[in-house]
């Protein structure tokens, strides 16, 4: 078998070679034709001592081949040993194959990093497919709070990750501006309007929004309308106050998001579904009714619910059970208005109508029970052509030195996103919000995230990038021609004798760099940007460990004054590390500093 050298995605390259071996065994009659190779994986082994990669090829093909897994593994391993990239192929356990690659693979992998620069790790698996990522979508009733922050960062990082993996991404915000909560907002703003005109409003009544952030809305209403709204009936002043309050709240929210470097391309108004001369909610219900998915009927009482909480009446129902939900769902309320669910169906149908077959929604922890009904609705309105993946982000517990943080006076009852960003910076917020899987509760300690220690992941990763540039600055005594520009520096170092990098710690870093493209693809396919954060921490940790090792063992230092060859090779390794750190941090929306201040 020829050896074309490692591809950008070394794991994909080896997987292709495993597939080629299986195809060769089919041609030889050792395997039957028609076997499904899609379940074969090539991945890092659980233990580093087991080699560089492992494959389950024999395990997943054995049944179809009517063979014992270990017997089939012997045939696959024998052919893999003849491959130019593979040094050893060993059978383990019930039939896994552990692979050790030849040393030059890792030096070639580093050259790939140097050659591709900030393009290294970028994938084409998305093939330009359109993906709609809807995130934040907070009610326009006040400033962003720390709970919104996690979903905002997660959604933004996921959108960047999918774009990096080759998808055509649209970032969308759904403005919930048609529910009862915006009427409460309007009444709260009207109270502040009266206050702006000099009236004593006393204590804010229970049920209205108490935060000081509504004072500017009241002042703006007073400046625009004088006292004319005081004499107007509620039917006249309510829509005026509502429109002004929503507009000013959305500007505030956009400003809060900008503090985290988050921007959306589309802001879609819920109210637009029923205004502007067409009722798209009614049209969607009619569309589903024509398909037989909407009917008039009665729901059985909820199990365990008190009788007084159940209203036995004829309702307009979506036949959600036909699409995997537990019960059919009401589309209209007792007063004749649409349920929120009905609006949600119509909204998601607009995504489909705009050409999105792949949708991702980022929701808060309190929406977990809503997933099945919306996924059922999307199956119905798209005839199964579109898919929705809902990512739930769990709660954030805001702490300072382990103690809960007190609420904000400005907001009334929560800590604002802006307060947190102003205190610790957007980098710390973004990285730490991603340094835990989205469906796990996150403890965010304001004191810990600004510590300069290895116990603070964002510092440790950014310090890895800064340490690399510190090494470059020190190296200019030996290499005064070492370029400042990253691409020119990579080209300068591309001719280094990187095969001289043979210490286990150096080889470990090379393997870690080679893992980056696979990590990107796996994270994108799973919609899990935290995998990038975890990877960056591991890469930075190995880099710091090698630096520390060189401090204790002079022959392993990055700069050896009397050995220009090994110094240049290690500078090439440093270039690879800082390049991948910068790439991964960019995906997460975090800066990669050249020095720590």
From Swiss-Prot:
It holds the Pfam family Arg_tRNA_synt_N. Its EC number is 6.1.1.19. The keyword Acyltransferase does not apply. Its main location: cytoplasm. Gene3D superfamilies: Arginyl tRNA synthetase N-terminal domain, HUPs, Isoleucyl-tRNA Synthetase, Domain 1. It is found in: Cytoplasm. A motif ('HIGH' region) lies at residues 138-148. The keyword DNA repair does not apply. Keywords: Aminoacyl-tRNA synthetase, ATP-binding, Cytoplasm, Ligase, Nucleotide-binding, Protein biosynthesis. One of its GO terms (biological process) is arginyl-tRNA aminoacylation. SMART domains: Arg_tRNA_synt_N, DALR_1. It catalyses: tRNA(Arg) + L-arginine + ATP = L-arginyl-tRNA(Arg) + AMP + diphosphate. One of its GO terms (cellular component) is cytoplasm. One of its GO terms (molecular function) is arginine-tRNA ligase activity. Belongs to the class-I aminoacyl-tRNA synthetase family. NCBIfam families: argS (TIGR00456). Monomer. This is Arginine--tRNA ligase.
């Amino acid at each position: 078998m020829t050896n074309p050298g490692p591809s950008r995605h070394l794991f994909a390259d080896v997987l292709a070679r495993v597939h080629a071996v299986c195809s060769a065994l089919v041609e030889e009659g050792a395997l039957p034709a028609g076997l499904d190779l899609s379940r074969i994986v090539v991945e890092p082994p659980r233990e580093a001592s087991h080699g560089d990669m492992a494959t389950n090829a024999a395990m997943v093909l054995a049944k179809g081949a009517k063979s014992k897994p270990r017997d089939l593994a012997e045939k696959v391993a024998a052919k893999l040993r003849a491959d130019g990239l593979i040094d050893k192929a060993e059978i383990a356990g019930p039939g896994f194959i552990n692979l050790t690659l030849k040393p030059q693979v890792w030096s070639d992998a580093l050259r790939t990093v140097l050659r591709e620069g900030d393009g290294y790790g970028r994938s084409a698996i998305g093939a330009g497919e359109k993906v709609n990522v809807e995130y934040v979508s907070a009610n326009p009733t006040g400033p962003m709070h720390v709970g919104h922050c996690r979903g905002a960062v997660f959604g933004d990082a996921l959108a960047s990750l999918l774009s990096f993996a080759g998808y055509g991404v649209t970032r969308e915000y759904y403005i919930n501006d048609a529910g009862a909560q915006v009427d409460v907002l309007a009444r709260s703003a009207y109270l502040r309007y009266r206050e702006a005109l000099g009236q004593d409003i006393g204590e804010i009544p229970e049920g209205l929004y108490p935060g000081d952030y509504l004072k500017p809305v009241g002042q703006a209403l007073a400046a625009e309308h004088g006292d004319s709204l005081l004499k107007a009936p509620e039917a006249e002043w309510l829509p005026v106050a509502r429109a002004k309050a929503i507009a000013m709240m959305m500007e505030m929210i956009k400003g809060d998001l900008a503090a985290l470097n988050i921007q959306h391309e589309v802001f879609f108004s819920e109210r637009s579904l029923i205004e502007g001369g067409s009722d798209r909610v009614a049209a969607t219900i009619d569309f589903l009714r024509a398909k037989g998915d909407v009917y008039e009927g009665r729901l059985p009482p909820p199990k365990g619910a008190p009788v007084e909480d159940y209203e036995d009446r004829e309702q307009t129902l979506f036949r959600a059970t036909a699409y995997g939900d537990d019960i059919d769902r009401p589309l209209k309320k007792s007063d004749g208005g649409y349920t929120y669910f009905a609006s949600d169906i119509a909204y998601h149908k607009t995504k489909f109508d705009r050409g999105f077959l792949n949708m991702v929604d980022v929701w808060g922890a309190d929406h977990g029970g809503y997933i099945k009904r919306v996924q059922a609705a999307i199956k119905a309105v798209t005839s199964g052509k579109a898919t929705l993946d809902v990512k739930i982000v769990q709660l954030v517990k805001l702490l300072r030195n382990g103690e809960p943080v007190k609420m904000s006076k400005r907001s009334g009852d929560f800590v604002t996103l802006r307060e947190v960003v102003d205190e610790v910076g957007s980098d710390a917020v973004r990285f730490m919000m991603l340094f835990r899987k989205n469906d796990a509760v996150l403890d965010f300690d304001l004191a810990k995230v600004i510590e300069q220690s290895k116990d603070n992941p964002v510092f440790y990763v950014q310090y890895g990038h800064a340490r690399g540039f510190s090494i470059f600055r020190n190296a200019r005594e030996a290499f005064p021609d070492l370029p400042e520009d990253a691409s020119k520096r990579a080209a300068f170092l591309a001719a280094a004798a990187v095969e001289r990098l043979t210490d286990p710690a150096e080889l470990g870093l090379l393997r870690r760099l080679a893992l980056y493209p696979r990590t990107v693809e796996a994270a994108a396919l799973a919609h899990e940007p935290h995998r990038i954060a975890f990877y960056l921490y591991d890469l930075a940790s190995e880099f710091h460990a090698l630096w520390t090792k060189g401090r204790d063992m002079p022959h392993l230092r990055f700069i050896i004054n009397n050995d220009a060859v090994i110094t240049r090779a290690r500078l090439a390794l440093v270039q690879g590390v800082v390049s991948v750190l910068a790439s991964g941090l960019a995906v997460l929306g975090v800066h990669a500093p050249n020095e720590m201040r």
